[in-house]
Amino acid sequence: MSNYSKIKDIILKLNSEELLKEKLYIVGGTVPYLISNTMSNREHSDIDIIVAANDMNAVREYLKDNNLYVKDFDSIMFDYNKAKIDYGIDCIIDGITVNFAPYEIVDNTMIQKNFLIKKSSGVNALVTVTIENVKIEDCTTTVIVGQTKIKTYNLEMVRVMKEKSHKQKDAVDIEVIDKYGYDEKKYNDLKIKTNNMKFK
């Protein structure tokens, strides 16, 4: 059974909050459905969001103000994060995990940080992904859902990322993108750039 309506409501609420407006980019499997304005028939386990590194303080402030902040979900507080570098934060809203991951653009390179927790992923890890020659405007778009303005990865970037996975849910999401349509030139350009994506 799909939980998409609940997921969509959470995304709309977060993007309506004064402290978070214009700061969030939705990047996960919900994007094809938000952009195409179609109902997802699959279960969505979480909401993936990237945030400019210098806006992460606003995210933490919002979570604390709304009793959503949990120290154990904040990467800065992890005992294995010795350098106390920000790799993002999770929170739980209406039973759904929402992940806020910081990104920055340095010398025309997109650097995204995130983390894995042993409880859910089987391993504790701090992850850095770099994509060269990509600006935020190359891989994002804006969509109006109802009355709410939402920033997301564009469909081309979502398709590229989904292709790197071989999960059934990603194949389903790619079908939605293909049915709606996307810019092949932009897609091919992003595909080339992400081929050199580095993980550490």
Name each model-derived stretch.
Residues 1-200:
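Compositionally biased terminal segments of proteins
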